[in-house]
């Protein structure tokens, strides 16, 4: 079987549980049942499927560098990720709970995060690109995988190779997907993404009725999910939230019988009308606060430490770092630490005489970061410490009370940016 000049090796679809719509009893006529990957019969309920589900895959560690060859280490607590997923799943019940693991699981490692979540009971994953879907498939052989960025021209065969599901956001993609399924007798599933207010990706709402009629006329339509995306879920009082929920409720009625998904991490903490059949948290899994409350309901996941290379005395009136932006107002003791913006530690976290910057933890005490963050190094004012420090001592940049949300504030960015920019010059450790 050929697609262009590339031979297509189509895997036999796996039997997996998938989100089920919660309005089946409301249907006055026969519902549109989402087909199984084989296209034969409606999917079974998750409880029945779980009874005969295969054992979870073994834990898969990611790639790392030797500790002796780098200046910093990054520890990811996979147990905390799994617990965060359980917390979110409980909050969203009876909706099913997926996991978004795009961007290398927000910088935490697709393979270890996916295998930990699969072991915790998660069986549906969302990624941005097909290359990420391949990694998820290797770590969770029985998972349902959706690819948010959809089908690039000529790439439909890639989805068939690993039994991944495209999230279709325009009619061109839908035409290509239908043609591929017809030519190759492929019965794999897909999602339809409708734009309800983000004005980014998604089919126009005006197309929903005609597409729903088309789906009703095709017994093996392959549409396993309809979805949209909230633009302002992190602002609970924003009027667009309720407008999007109302518009999506209308779409869901048109596609009665097909599971529906709207809520992201913050959307889970809106009222339950945003939950529908499947929620898809991302940033909250990795320890960021998905609410506007000061108390974070998520467990911290990431700890970032770097080694102290040198401690030195700086006379009063002397400056530190590029641009001479920070001036010692007294005789000061500073520590030079082996991490910088090349490692993803944001340059705006540095400070100047006019602006306070971020902090790090040394010997259990918070100390200010001073001067500019440079490519490989930063400086910390440790004058207030009462104990001696030594070359090779650890300094904590994330952890010991410093979370990704606080660091994002120092960097004048968002928590997503903090996590996904963390680089690969670390010795990485995955706790599980």
Language-model-detected regions and their locations in the chain:
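Active-site-proximal beta-alpha core segment in soluble small-molecule metabolic enzymes
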Residues: 60-68, 72-83, 93-250, 254-261, ...
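N-terminal acidic, proline/glycine-rich, low-complexity intrinsically disordered segments
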Residues: 1-33
């Amino acid at each position: 079987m050929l697609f262009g000049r590339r031979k297509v090796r189509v895997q036999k679809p796996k039997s997996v549980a998938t989100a089920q719509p919660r309005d089946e009893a409301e249907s006055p006529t026969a519902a549109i049942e989402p087909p199984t990957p084989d296209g034969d019969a409606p999917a079974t309920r998750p409880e029945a499927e779980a009874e005969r589900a295969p054992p979870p895959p073994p834990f898969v560690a990611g790639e790392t560098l030797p500790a002796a060859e780098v200046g910093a280490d990054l520890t990811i607590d996979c147990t905390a990720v799994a617990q965060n997923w359980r917390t979110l799943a409980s909050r969203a019940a009876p909706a099913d709970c997926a996991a978004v693991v795009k961007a290398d699981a927000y910088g935490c490692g697709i393979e270890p995060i996916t295998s930990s979540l699969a072991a915790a009971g998660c069986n549906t994953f969302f990624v941005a690109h097909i290359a990420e879907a391949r990694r998820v498939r290797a770590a969770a052989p029985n998972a349902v995988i959706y690819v948010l960025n959809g089908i690039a021209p000529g790439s439909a065969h890639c989805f068939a190779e690993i039994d991944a599901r495209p999230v279709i956001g325009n009619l061109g993609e839908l035409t290509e997907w239908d043609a591929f399924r017809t030519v190759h007798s492929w019965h794999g599933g897909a999602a339809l993404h409708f734009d309800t207010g983000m004005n980014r990706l998604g089919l126009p709402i005006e197309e929903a009725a005609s597409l729903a009629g088309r789906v009703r006329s095709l017994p093996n339509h392959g549409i396993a999910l309809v979805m949209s995306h909230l633009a302002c879920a992190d602002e609970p009082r924003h009027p667009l939230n309720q407008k999007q929920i109302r518009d999506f409720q209308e779409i869901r009625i048109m596609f009665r019988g097909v599971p529906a998904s709207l809520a992201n991490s913050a959307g889970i903490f809106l009222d339950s009308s945003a939950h529908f059949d499947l929620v898809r948290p991302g940033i909250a899994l990795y320890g960021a606060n998905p609410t506007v409350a000061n108390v974070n309901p998520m467990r911290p996941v990431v700890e970032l430490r770097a080694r102290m290379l040198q401690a030195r005395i700086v006379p009063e009136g002397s400056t530190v770092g590029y641009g001479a932006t920070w001036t010692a107002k007294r005789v000061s003791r500073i520590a030079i630490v082996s991490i910088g913006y090349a490692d993803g530690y944001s340059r705006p976290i540095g400070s100047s005489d006019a602006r306070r910057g971020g902090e790090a933890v040394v010997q259990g005490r918070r100390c200010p970061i001073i001067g500019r963050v440079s490519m490989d190094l930063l400086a910390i004012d440790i004058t207030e410490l009462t104990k001696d420090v030594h070359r090779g001592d650890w300094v904590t940049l994330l952890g010991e009370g410093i979370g990704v949300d606080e660091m994002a504030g120092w960097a004048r960015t968002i928590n997503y940016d903090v996590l996904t920019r963390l680089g690969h010059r670390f010795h990485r450790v995955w706790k599980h």
